[in-house]
Amino acid sequence: MNTPPEAKTRVTQAQDETFMRLAIEEARRAAEAGDVPVGAIVVDASGNIVGRGRNRREVCQDPTAHAEIEAVREAARTRGAWRLLGTTVYVTLEPCPMCAGALVNARVARVVYGCKDLKAGAVDTHFAIGRLISLNHRFEVQGDVLYDECVSLLRGFFAVRRKSKVGQEQLSQDEPTTDTTDTNDAPTT
């Protein structure tokens, strides 16, 4: 694999878990606002948080308001540059094709996700967008960090929505399928 030098990061499992917990907090905020609970954090090479985001599609009525996009936008503003070289993005759910493409364009070094998205996962599950040799940039991928916590958050959110039957038709279109959910029951975020 042709991984750029700036992507060869040395991060411990404990550091990954610490930052993933912050992404989980963002996901909880999304759920509290009525959005699918997905959260993201962008961390620079020195360990500073430069961007935070959470799913805000319902709040903003914007199909591009995914957690990763929100976090990358904030990181670019914070750094004053669209190239986010040397950064790691922590996200609770595997990025979709749109977000994976944005992460390539932002030149992130590494993507760490909590659980796979079997319907739209684009960095491991269906595609490996961040590792395509044909693209102008590649990034490292690490999955299943705090997997149980990330899956639990999604399951809990959708269980409540099912019980309340609020937006039942929309629910079937919004729920991501993780590798432990019924694939007939859960479309993508």
Question: What is the predicted role of each segment?
Answer:
Residues 1-30, 49, 95-98, 102-189:
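Zinc-dependent deaminase
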Residues 34-38, 85:
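Short, basic and Ser/Thr-rich N-terminal targeting/leader segments
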Residues 51-53:
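Short hydrophobic alpha-helix segments
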Residues 81-94:
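Immediate flanking context of iron-sulfur cluster ligation sites
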Residues 59-69:
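A short, polar/charged loop-to-alpha-helix boundary motif
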Residues 69-76:
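Glycine-rich oxoanion-binding loops at beta->alpha junctions
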Residues 38-47:
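Short beta-strand scaffold segments in enzyme catalytic cores
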